[in-house]
């Protein structure tokens, strides 16, 4: 049978949205609606000229006019002469528009009240002003220029070009209130000068007259100034942009004088620079042998008479040459780039973001209108379309009442007001009444289009009416409710029960459901077999449920797959295809192995069934969606269709060995012989026996032999105890070697054997199985003692509250772990006797369940038989008192109360966080939905470099896991032999990875979607292997959606899992030391240390690292050397595995004395920069640095100074929260005058300073102060999801680190605007202002001698001896690079901790202060690859903590999407604007276009946008509108006349097309499926 021809829908490739002109609206309409009436209450027929008029909208019954004169189809197309209704289908009432002719124009509210207002932007008025005009509160006055003013108007950026009689004139718009209007007497003044009006009418008039072309030119010119660079400076630039020009030349003059360059004898000022650039004056670059001086300025008239050989130039080029010649003369590297950059920055700074954004916004809008050929006046409505009546139905309820759509109400108000306004105008009513009516009409139309945007119309019972916009937006709107999520016919749902007898590709379908779902197929089969003659009789048979029906049902269902789906559908494995087997009863039977992918259990879950109808759909279900095709997860490539619980327990039990069991030590000639012996009862299932297998004698058990019999033929003999992980590996391996069919069969066999032996093992749980460890009491006693010691330290004031908390948490975490360890040890050692057999401890049922991975975790058993341990508060902090009992002993009342905390948090979290995770998934899917594999190979040479991930010295993700299945980006050679291991663009397979490991290769450059160069979508080689199929990804695979699901699904899952543990928190054990994990030689790289009194080596810098080298000198391990750590090894020392290299105190950062000497505190003032806290519990005093008022932070800089024995001062900044560790008896409080405060307040102010008593010294290596770290908190994904969101939304972190943009050497200065020098004895004070370019080289509170330089360039010198006071705002870190001469200056606010030292060497991208790195900074400084690596690493940390595996490539896909945009830094000759953010694709197209026309291409830099913004700024307006902010997206798209190229998935779903992925891509669209009858059985 040939496939039936289907009626093809019109294929189209793109959809354009634009504004409708009044003519277009009238052309849609079938008639004008003049009356607000709907139906006649007696006849219930529509009223003539009303909102449901059949003459306008079409007949109510099919092929029947209203009066009933014409009935039947033969009259189709006739218009009834009596009632005027066309005889046609009643469906036309769903598609025919009407219209209302408005008596006065009305503004479309979308264009008035959007932010920013479109009309406002166009007229350069604020949205508030436009509103006042539209709602008749103010006048719009147009000021025309007089002849004298014309030129001034033209230059004024505030004027607007309007067309009048073919000419364009510049006018000014004023919005004037009524009172002002009367005062100014505009009415009576010059009619040619002023024109005025109110309401939408006047606005329309102005909009219609705007000359868009000229406005665009003018805006471009304004923008052009801000794109100016050094090379653009000339006379015309000066004329056009005087302000920018002046700023630039002042900057050049400043830079020239900084380097000491002179024009002859003259100091360079802006005057000299100006004459050279704009007035044609020359400068001498090379005086040759003449008397002229280098740099001398020459009048243009005298140039011709210059002596021979003299080189003189003019313009900006002259300045550049002069500068370079000068720098070469003084033997310095010429870096004119620095000047160019600073000129560029000065000009850019003038174009503040707001100013530039506004111009760009206006220009975009104007160009949008020009390109789309929309007219601005179409934003004002003259004609209002009336949507078809069946889309706003009026339904008769019983009892003679009607339910009506809100739209009818809204339309009625519009018509009423419109008719009243017409009447008033005809009656020539007073202006004020007409004005009021016009305003009311405007409000009525506003409410119809978007109710609630301005004012809110409500029903009688105060419910806001649902307007047209409301029916589009939000979850219940048209897009999300009806277009993206349709309900499907041929589906049903029911409860699921387990079906262990099924095969893996089958499900049990209740006969009742099947009968309903397959009805049409059954009818057909009944007719074919001659049981029924017509559909009608077939229907009857089915209703009567005769036996023949069931016979046909069996045949129809055979080989017809159905789809099963379990909500929530979080990833593609939540919908799978099965072959139905008919079952009695009403429940769907589900195969137990497919529960994990569905996340289903049998405690009342329901599932939905869908029937694929067409042959193509059935084929796709079979080939792609059958459950046997979904064994591996697309998120990480490991099996997800997996045995669990009982099955695992059974397999675990049958592969155990039982010592001294019956028949131990017997020898068998073949596996079959051994199995027979077991079946005859001669040997025990678990007895150790010897068997000849493949010619070798193997020691094994009968159980293992039975297990091996179900494995595929030729698979190696598995001779070990199996648990969940090993079974997963086994399945993975079988899949790899034998393909998915064999894997599926093996899974089925494992299921059967697992259930069988779980039954035989009869493992059950009993209270006696929970062994409470004997050593528990001792461990607890020890922990209690330790905790008491910590309390004592706290009471004695040695440690702070925070440190006490952290230490106690650490003690109890360790104690809990020890108890658990002991418990498991005891369980393993304890023997039990059953039926005369001795079973070792590992046969303890509870232990077996946990160790096999069948159910429960070590944590849960710990709570049952060990101790419950620490509990978390709802805030995530730990409660210091742990629960020492376990569930077997029972909890005390207090313990029970403490544990309710966590349990309740779990339940509350589950409810709240599910929504958060769901929303994250939705944003991810939206941003990545159009990433599809569109080609085999894009041919790029780029890639990213990957290596293993190491966290605190441990390999968390091995190298091979990161590269397997990816493609190389370049050839890889063996570093020792030089042989080629793999060429570029080849797949990295398991064999290749082994080669890499042998050759010791630790990093390799691989292809990645981040660097893929496909214009749309990505190519297969950049993506690599499809994780679920273990082969190169297919063209057409929707990898974007898969990425979104893989990242979103665990988020949703994990937030639902919190409450299972019941709040029992596990603190991450704190790392306090580095241990060598290999033997080798120690290499200390850049580690500086001091030796303290006890002879310990303390590390005193942060950039060092400790390496372990092997015999060849290759680095095998690398540990960061933390500041303040005690170093236990020497450089070059040989160490064994397990040697402690360094150890540190984890709960605070110390400040260590680098040298011994006297101590002095500066600016440490009680109640100003220091708070004295007395602990109520301990009675001890703790001094903590803090700023009590923000103002204090500017005036004071707390510091600790050690006057070293070597005569140098060692200064340490004390950041906020620092705790002083100088013993209280060595401190004293001294009242003294504070010069900084006195200066600021202009009156004498005294403070209480904390000072160190004379004679108190510290030794080298003493800890003088410490900065405590945060309290330990529970890290679960609920804390982690917001972090993932922060990363993917590209938000700036709250406490962001400052990072350096260049390599270089660090210098740290005070960031002070003024220096005050004070000599109290002589009563002298002197204040110096510090320019931005100079750096203060003296510290606050230091003493200086007369004549000493206070700043780096020597421009400020102390006039007398005295003390320095700085009005400081923090520090300035300057990074200087000697090679390039580049210098960057960073301001660090007070209280932020600087982690670099003076003169330390930094690399671009290194952090200078503490805090979280800001991704935008990383992108700017280090580029896309580093940023991507950072985002992937940070996001993976969150998931890894939860034990969730997600392949890196999924994050890469999302990151590719949020890096799609670039910011234009130089528009060149392109259509782009300065600072505009555009799509990379658009940029590339434009660059090619500009180059082909011989222009200057634009330059751009990458920007990072968050996932929400990326989804909203996608090229498809349909997709963006269905995501968020629907009305705004649609309004913008309409004005610009945007075209949607329909390249993504969502937009095609919305228009009802086939999605361009999988079999829907263009390549497959021509394929036709032909079925031949006899082949059908084998489909």
Swiss-Prot record:
Protein name per the record: DNA-directed RNA polymerase subunit beta'
What cofactor is needed?
Mg(2+); Zn(2+)
Q: What organism is the protein native to?
A: Sulfurihydrogenibium sp. (strain YO3AOP1)
Q: Which residues bind Mg(2+)?
A: 601, 603, 605
GO MF, any single term: zinc ion binding
List positions binding Zn(2+) 2.
Answer: 938, 1012, 1019, 1022
Q: Which Pfam families match?
A: RNA_pol_Rpb1_1, RNA_pol_Rpb1_2, RNA_pol_Rpb1_3, RNA_pol_Rpb1_4, RNA_pol_Rpb1_5
- State the protein's purpose: DNA-dependent RNA polymerase catalyzes the transcription of DNA into RNA using the four ribonucleoside triphosphates as substrates.
How the protein assembles, per its UniProt entry? The RNAP catalytic core consists of 2 alpha, 1 beta, 1 beta' and 1 omega subunit. When a sigma factor is associated with the core the holoenzyme is formed, which can initiate transcription.
**Binding site residues for Zn(2+) 1:** 65, 67, 80, 83
Q: Which residues form a coiled coil?
A: none
Q: Which GO terms describe its cellular component?
A: DNA-directed RNA polymerase complex
Name the HAMAP family for this protein.
RNApol_bact_RpoC (MF_01322)
């Amino acid at each position: 049978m040939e496939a039936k021809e289907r009626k093809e829908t019109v294929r189209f490739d793109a959809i354009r949205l634009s504004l409708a002109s009044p003519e277009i609206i009238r052309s849609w309409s079938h008639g004008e609606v003049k009356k607000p009436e709907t139906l006649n209450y007696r006849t219930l027929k529509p009223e003539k000229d009303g909102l449901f008029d059949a003459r306008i909208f079409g007949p109510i019954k099919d092929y029947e006019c209203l009066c009933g004169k014409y009935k039947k189809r033969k009259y189709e197309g006739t218009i009834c002469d009596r009632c005027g209704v066309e005889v046609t289908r009643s469906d036309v009432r769903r598609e025919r528009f009407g219209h209302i002719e408005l008596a006065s124009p009305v503004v479309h509210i979308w264009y008035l009240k959007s932010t920013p207002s479109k009309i406002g932007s166009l007229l350069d008025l604020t949205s508030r002003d436009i509103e006042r005009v539209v709602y008749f509160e103010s006048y719009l006055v147009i000021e025309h220029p007089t002849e004298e003013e014309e030129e001034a108007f033209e230059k004024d950026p505030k004027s607007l070009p309007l067309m009048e009689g073919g000419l364009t004139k510049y006018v000014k718009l004023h919005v004037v209130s009524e009172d002002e209007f009367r005062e100014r007497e505009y009415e009576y003044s010059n009619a040619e000068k002023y024109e005025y009006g109110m309401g939408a009418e006047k606005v329309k008039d102005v909009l219609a007259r705007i000359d868009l072309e000229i406005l665009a030119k003018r805006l471009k010119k304004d923008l052009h100034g801000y794109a100016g660079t050094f090379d653009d400076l000339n006379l015309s630039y000066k004329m056009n942009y005087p302000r920018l020009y002046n700023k630039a030349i002042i900057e050049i003059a400043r830079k020239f004088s900084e380097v000491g360059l002179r024009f002859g004898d003259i100091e360079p000022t802006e005057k000299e620079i100006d004459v050279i650039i704009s007035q044609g004056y020359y400068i001498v670059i090379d005086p040759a042998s003449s008397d002229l001086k280098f740099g001398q300025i020459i009048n243009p008239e005298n140039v011709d008479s210059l002596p021979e050989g003299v080189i003189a130039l003019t313009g900006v080029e002259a300045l550049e040459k002069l500068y370079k010649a000068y720098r070469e003369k003084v033997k310095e590297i010429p870096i004119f780039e620095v000047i160019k950059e600073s000129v560029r920055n000065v000009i850019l700074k003038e174009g503040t973001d707001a100013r530039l954004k506004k111009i760009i916004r206006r220009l975009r809008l104007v160009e949008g209108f020009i390109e789309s050929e929309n007219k601005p006046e179409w934003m004002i409505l003259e004609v209002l379309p009336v949507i078809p009546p069946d889309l706003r139905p009026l339904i008769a309820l019983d009892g003679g009442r009607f339910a009506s759509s809100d739209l009818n109400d809204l339309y009625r108000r519009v018509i009423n007001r419109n008719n009243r306004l017409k009447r008033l105008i005809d009656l020539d009513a007073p202006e004020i009444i007409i004005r009021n009516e016009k305003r009311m009409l405007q409000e009525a139309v506003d409410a119809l289009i978007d109710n609630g945007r301005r004012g809110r119309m409500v029903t009688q019972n105060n419910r806001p009416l649902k307007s047209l916009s409301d029916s589009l937006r939000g979850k219940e709107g048209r897009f999300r409710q009806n277009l993206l999520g349709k309900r499907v016919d041929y589906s049903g749902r029911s409860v699921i029960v387990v079906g262990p007898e099924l095969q893996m590709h089958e499900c049990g379908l209740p006969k009742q459901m099947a009968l309903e779902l397959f009805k049409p197929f059954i009818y057909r089969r009944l007719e074919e077999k001659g049981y029924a003659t017509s559909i009608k009789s077939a229907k009857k048979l089915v209703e009567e449920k005769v036996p023949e029906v069931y016979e046909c049902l069996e045949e129809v269902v055979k080989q017809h797959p159905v789809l099963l789906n379990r909500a929530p559908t979080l990833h593609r494995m939540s919908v799978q295809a099965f072959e139905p087997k008919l079952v009695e009863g009403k429940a769907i039977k589900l195969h137990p192995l497919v529960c994990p992918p569905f996340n289903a259990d049998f405690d009342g879950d329901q599932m939905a069934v869908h029937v694929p109808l067409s042959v193509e759909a059935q084929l796709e279900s079979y080939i792609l969606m059958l459950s046997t095709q979904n064994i591996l997860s697309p998120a990480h490539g490991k099996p997800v269709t997996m045995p669990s619980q009982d099955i695992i327990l059974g397999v675990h039990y049958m592969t155990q060995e039982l010592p001294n069991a019956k028949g131990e030590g017997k020898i068998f000639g073949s596996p079959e012989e051994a199995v027979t012996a077991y079946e005859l009862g001669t040997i025990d299932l678990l007895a150790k026996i010897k068997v000849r297998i493949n010619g070798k004698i193997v020691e094994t058990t009968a159980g293992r032999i039975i297990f091996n019999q179900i494995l595929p033929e030729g698979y190696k003999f598995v001779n070990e105890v199996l648990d969940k992980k090993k079974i997963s590996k086994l399945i993975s391996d079988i899949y790899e070697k034998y393909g998915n069919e064999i894997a599926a069969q093996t899974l089925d066999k494992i299921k059967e054997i697992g259930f069988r032996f779980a039954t035989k093992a009869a493992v059950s749980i009993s209270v006696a199985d929970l062994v409470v460890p004997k050593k528990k009491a001792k461990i607890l006693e020890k922990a209690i003692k330790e905790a008491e010691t910590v309390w004592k330290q706290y009471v004695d004031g040695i440690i702070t509250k925070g440190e006490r908390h952290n230490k106690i948490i650490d003690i109890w975490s360790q104690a809990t772990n020890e108890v658990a360890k002991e418990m498991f040890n005891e369980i393993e050692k304890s023997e039990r006797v059953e039926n005369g057999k001795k079973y070792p401890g590992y046969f303890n049922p509870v232990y077996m369940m946990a160790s096999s991975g069948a159910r429960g975790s070590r944590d849960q058993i710990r709570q049952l038989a060990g101790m419950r341990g620490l509990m978390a508060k709802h805030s995530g902090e730990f409660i210091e008192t742990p629960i020492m009992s376990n569930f077997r002993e029972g909890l005390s009342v207090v313990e029970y109360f403490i544990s309710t905390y966590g349990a309740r948090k779990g339940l509350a979290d589950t409810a709240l966080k599910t929504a958060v995770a769901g929303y994250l998934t939705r944003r991810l899917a939206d941003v990545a939905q159009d990433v599809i594999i569109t080609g085999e190979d894009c041919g790029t040479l780029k890639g990213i470099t990957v290596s293993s991930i190491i966290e605190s010295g441990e390999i968390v993700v091995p190298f091979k896991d990161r590269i397997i299945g990816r493609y190389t980006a370049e050839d890889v050679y063996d570093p020792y032999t030089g042989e080629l291991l793999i060429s570029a663009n080849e797949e990295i397979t398991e064999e290749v990875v082994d080669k890499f490991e042998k050759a010791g290769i630790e990093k390799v450059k691989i292809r990645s979607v981040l660097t893929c160069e496909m214009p749309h979508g990505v190519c297969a080689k950049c993506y690599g292997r499809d994780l679920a199929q273990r082969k190169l990804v297919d063209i057409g695979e929707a990898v974007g959606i898969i990425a979104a699901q893989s990242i979103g699904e665990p988020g949703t899952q994990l937030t639902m899992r919190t409450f299972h543990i019941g709040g029992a928190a596990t603190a991450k054990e704190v790392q306090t030391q580095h241990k060598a994990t290999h033997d080798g030689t120690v290499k200390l790289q850049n580690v500086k240390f001091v030796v303290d009194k006890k002879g310990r080596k303390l590390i005193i810098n942060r950039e060092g690292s400790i390496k372990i080298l092997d015999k060849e000198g290759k680095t095998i391990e690398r540990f960061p050397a933390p500041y303040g750590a005690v170093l236990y090894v020497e450089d070059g020392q040989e160490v064994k595995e397990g040697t402690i290299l360094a150890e540190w105190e984890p709960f605070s950062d110390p400040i260590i004395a680098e040298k011994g000497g006297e101590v002095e505190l500066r600016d440490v003032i009680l109640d100003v920069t220091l708070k004295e806290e007395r602990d109520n519990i301990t009675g001890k005093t703790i001094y903590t640095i803090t700023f009590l008022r923000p103002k204090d932070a500017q005036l004071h800089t707390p510091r600790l100074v050690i006057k070293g024995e070597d005569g140098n001062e060692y200064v340490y900044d004390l950041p906020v929260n620092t705790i002083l560790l100088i013993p209280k008896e060595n401190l004293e409080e001294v009242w003294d005058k504070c010069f900084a405060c006195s200066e600021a307040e202009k009156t004498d102010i005294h403070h209480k300073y904390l000072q160190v008593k004379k004679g108190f010294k510290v030794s080298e290596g003493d800890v003088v102060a410490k900065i405590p770290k945060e309290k330990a908190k529970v890290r679960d994904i609920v804390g982690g999801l917001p972090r993932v969101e922060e990363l993917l939304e590209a938000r700036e972190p709250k406490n962001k680190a400052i990072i350096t943009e260049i390599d270089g050497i660090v210098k740290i200065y005070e960031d002070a605007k003024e220096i005050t020098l004070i000599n109290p004895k002589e009563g002298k004070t002197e204040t110096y202002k510090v320019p931005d370019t100079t750096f203060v080289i003296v510290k606050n509170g230091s003493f200086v001698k007369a004549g000493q330089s206070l700043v780096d360039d020597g421009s400020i010198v102390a006039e007398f001896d005295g003390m320095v006071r700085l009005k400081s705002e923090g520090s300035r870190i300057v990074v200087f690079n000697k090679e390039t001469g580049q210098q960057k200056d960073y301001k660090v606010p007070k209280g932020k901790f600087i982690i670099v030292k003076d003169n330390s060497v930094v690399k671009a991208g290194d952090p200078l202060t503490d805090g979280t790195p800001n991704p935008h900074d990383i992108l700017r400084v280090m580029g896309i690859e580093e940023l991507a690596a950072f985002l992937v690493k940070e996001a993976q940390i969150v998931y890894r903590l939860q034990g969730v595996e997600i392949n890196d490539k999924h994050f890469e896909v999302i990151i590719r999407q949020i890096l799609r945009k670039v910011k234009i830094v130089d528009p060149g000759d392109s259509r782009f604007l300065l600072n505009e953010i555009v799509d990379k694709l658009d940029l590339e197209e434009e660059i090619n276009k500009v180059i082909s026309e011989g222009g200057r291409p634009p330059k751009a830099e990458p920007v990072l946008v968050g996932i929400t913004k990326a989804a909203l700024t996608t090229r498809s307006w349909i997709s963006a509108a269905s995501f968020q902010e629907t009305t705004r997206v649609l309004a913008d798209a309409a004005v610009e006349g945007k075209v949607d190229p329909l390249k993504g998935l969502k937009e095609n779903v919305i228009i009802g097309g086939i999605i361009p992925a999988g079999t829907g891509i263009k390549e497959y669209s021509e394929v036709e499926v032909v079925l031949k009858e006899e082949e059908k059985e084998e489909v």
